[in-house]
Amino acid sequence: MPVLNTSNLLTRPQIIAVLTENYADLAQQFSVASLALFGSYARDEQTPQSDVDLLVTFSKPVGFAFMHLADRLEAPLGKRVDLLAADGIKPNRRDSIHASLIHVAP
């Protein structure tokens, strides 16, 4: 298991680059249709303790692979990843999530 990066801040462009580089593999392996960054990294308000918040849309149901996707992304990012399925956004959080949303792929 990789050691997560708690002392070094990644930048938004670095995160977007990692996600873009890995998108084709994620689409094939996990049926990822789209990825979007939101939260503190999207707003450039991250701290060393911040996780990477990602909104994911899948091309088909993925079941437990959802959890494996988070693990797969934590390795290249060196940060804890918090995934949210696009169809799982609670109505009371929709506006705040969409306010900081940065579409990464495709």
Where are these regions (language model features)?
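Catalytic core of pol beta-like nucleotidyltransferases
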Residues: M1-S34, R43-P48, F58-P106
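Conserved histidines in hydrophobic membrane contexts and catalytic metal-binding motifs
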Residues: L37
